[in-house]
Design a protein with these regions (language model features):
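Conserved ABC ATPase signature
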Residues: 137-141, 145
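Conserved structural motif at the start of ABC-family nucleotide-binding domains
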Residues: 5-7, 20-22
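The feature captures the beta-strand-to-loop junction immediately N-terminal to the Walker
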Residues: 36-39
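Conserved ABC transporter NBD signature motif
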Residues: 28, 59-67, 76, 173
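Catalytic Walker B motif of ABC-type/P-loop ATPase nucleotide-binding domains
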Residues: 162-166
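Helix-to-loop junction immediately C-terminal to a conserved catalytic motif
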Residues: 52
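Conserved ABC ATPase "signature" region
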Residues: 100, 115-133, 158
């Protein structure tokens, strides 16, 4: 039986420097929480970005037996969610609109989200304790609030593989605990 998820011989050079050198590992069953540990600058973020297709690399990544490199970006987005340390969102939009971005793979370009999608987005914001900020401009939120909104977006994406890059780095102690608990429940 094939592994649920496997990384085989991932190698990557950036700026002439070898960042990843034949990295391999596998996860046999879904629902597992796996951590990548290593020093600052050790390539953890680079590996996550390579796995989700953001960085070109040598080697192979498989999810449920399908090689991710062969998938179109929309199909890849249906299967894999990457949650970076910083969201990269730099345009003014409400917190609920950020969460609604999680439905992108299921929406046609420029289509309006349905009432059901809006309700699901609001439930996700409620789940992470941010429902009261649904209409606030995302750019005005604190770093921790932004991370919780991004977690809410991840909840509506409903993908098979979630890749978190330091998801609790901007959170206070209480929200760190809540974030870890929510990740374990996904």
């Amino acid at each position: 039986m094939a592994d649920f998820f496997s990384v085989q011989d991932i190698s990557l050079c950036l700026g002439g420097r070898q960042i990843l050198d034949h990295v391999s590992f596998s996860v046999d069953t879904p629902g597992r929480v796996i951590g990548l540990l290593g020093p600052n600058g050790g390539g953890k973020t680079t590996l996550l970005r390579a796995i989700c297709g953001e960085l070109p690399h040598d080697g192979h990544v498989f999810l449920e037996g399908a090689e991710l490199a062969g998938l179109r970006s929309k199909e890849l987005a249906r299967r894999v969610s990457y949650i970076p340390q910083l969201s990269g969102i730099s345009i003014s939009m409400s917190a609920i609109d950020v969460v609604l971005m999680g439905f992108y793979p299921k929406l046609k370009l420029l289509s309006q989200p349905s009432a059901d999608m809006r309700a699901a987005a609001l439930r996700a914001l409620e789940q992470v304790g941010m429902a009261g900020l649904a209409d606030r401009d995302y750019l005005t939120l604190s770093g921790g609030e932004k991370q919780l909104v991004i977690l809410a977006r991840t909840l509506v994406e409903d993908t098979k593989l979630l890749l978190f890059d330091e998801p609790d780095s901007s959170l206070d102690l209480g929200n760190k605990y809540r974030m870890v608990r929510m990740i374990m429940e996904l």
